[in-house]
């Protein structure tokens, strides 16, 4: 704030704008999203030439607002601000903000299920980042790639990435935040592999993947300590959410809910949305369990609603079902809505895991859905729950 005051007093518009936008970025990292957006708006006013087109240096403020709007799940507004910020930053030769703006574009494409456009944008960002030497952006793009591959069920490619970069994950030569992002990408691979093994090959769930979850949780403990020590609350929330997913994959629901509860308590005052819903169906299961336990019920219900709204590939809810569910299928569906895993449903109903999977597949087929979140949303719209 002192640099803002001094540069403003000296009439240095560019320095004032840069210092103000930098303050907004710091506030965002501290988890103060509402303060950050107000700071970026102040920067926009500084960059405004009496109602004419803003000066190129205002691009950094536009991109900052775009990132916050994305977190709040206002995708259309995020696109608008990102594109404006990219255009201004290109005019001003500010490559770092061009990269940040295009990162928002990649995230929005991913959120909308536009996989091809997301991959293409990631490729463009990677090329530019490599050309100009931005290791953090390269690590950020790797994480987005991992999320896209996992969403596609392409664990082979994600696992190959993990093998290829295993040495660099512990490379102390890269900047700390890039190192953190790489480790987060690695954790995502380990969680996805474990969840896949638990659902497809239950007899192997406790063998190599148990060790992988120990590795993932070990990485997350280190990351959490670093983020807490430096006051980066936004990273703390993200890491806690991943911790919850890792504990869930390990079968430790108590620890999973504890980590999720901490994340929600930090996130609720600032209205975080995408940090949670970008994790997809595994997070939806945890959120349903949190709602059932009365943890931040209003906030969690809103997150679940955002998740269900984002299931664009689901059917129109007004369409009636052509074939009704059996009593057993309804029973399974209610347990799914309560957040129980396949294994927990099997124990609850005293049936084989394969039978649970068969019932769930029948439910999906009859309801015309592809995921638990879509099934629960459809059932709620039809008054079945």
Predicted regions and their residues:
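Helix-turn-helix DNA-binding segment
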Residues: 308, 312-361, 365-370, 374-385
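Helix-coil-helix junctions within alpha-helical repeat/solenoid scaffolds
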Residues: 1-10, 19-314, 359
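Transmembrane helices and adjacent periplasmic/lumenal helix-loop junctions
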Residues: 13
């Amino acid at each position: 704030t002192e640099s803002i005051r001094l540069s403003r007093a000296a009439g240095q518009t560019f320095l004032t704008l840069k210092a103000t936008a930098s303050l907004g970025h710091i506030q965002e990292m501290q988890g103060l999203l509402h303060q950050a957006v107000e700071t970026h708006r102040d920067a926009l006013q500084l960059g405004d030439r009496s109602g004419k087109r803003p000066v190129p240096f205002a691009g950094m403020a536009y991109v900052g607002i775009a990132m916050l709007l994305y977190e709040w799940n206002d995708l259309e507004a995020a696109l608008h601000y990102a594109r404006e910020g990219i255009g201004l930053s290109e005019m001003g030769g500010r490559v770092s903000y061009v990269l940040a703006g295009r990162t928002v574009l990649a995230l929005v494409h991913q959120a909308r299920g536009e996989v091809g456009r997301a991959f293409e944008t990631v490729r463009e960002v990677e090329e530019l980042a490599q050309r100009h030497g931005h290791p953090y952006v390269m690590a950020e793009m790797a994480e987005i790639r991992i999320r896209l591959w996992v969403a596609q069920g392409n664990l082979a490619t994600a696992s190959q990435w993990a093998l290829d970069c295993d040495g660099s994950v512990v490379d102390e030569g890269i900047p700390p935040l890039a190192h953190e992002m790489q480790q987060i990408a690695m954790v995502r691979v380990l969680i996805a592999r474990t969840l896949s093994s638990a659902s497809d090959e239950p007899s192997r769930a406790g063998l190599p993947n148990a060790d992988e979850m120990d590795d993932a949780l070990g990485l997350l403990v280190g990351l959490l300590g670093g983020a807490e020590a430096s006051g980066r609350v936004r990273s703390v929330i993200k890491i806690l959410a991943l911790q919850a997913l890792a504990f869930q994959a390990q079968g430790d629901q108590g620890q999973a809910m504890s980590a999720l509860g901490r994340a929600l308590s930090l996130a609720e005052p600032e209205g975080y949305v995408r940090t949670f819903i970008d994790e997809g169906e595994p997070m939806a299961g945890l959120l349903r369990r949190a709602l059932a336990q009365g943890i931040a019920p209003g906030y969690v219900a809103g997150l679940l609603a955002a998740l269900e709204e984002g299931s664009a590939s689901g059917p129109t809810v007004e369409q009636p079902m052509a074939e009704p569910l059996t009593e057993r299928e309804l029973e399974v569906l209610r347990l799914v809505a309560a957040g129980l895993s396949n294994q927990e449903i099997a124990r609850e109903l005293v049936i084989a895991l394969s039978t649970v999977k068969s019932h769930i597949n029948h439910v999906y087929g009859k309801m015309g859905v592809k995921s638990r979140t879509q099934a629960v949303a459809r059932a709620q719209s039809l008054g079945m729950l």
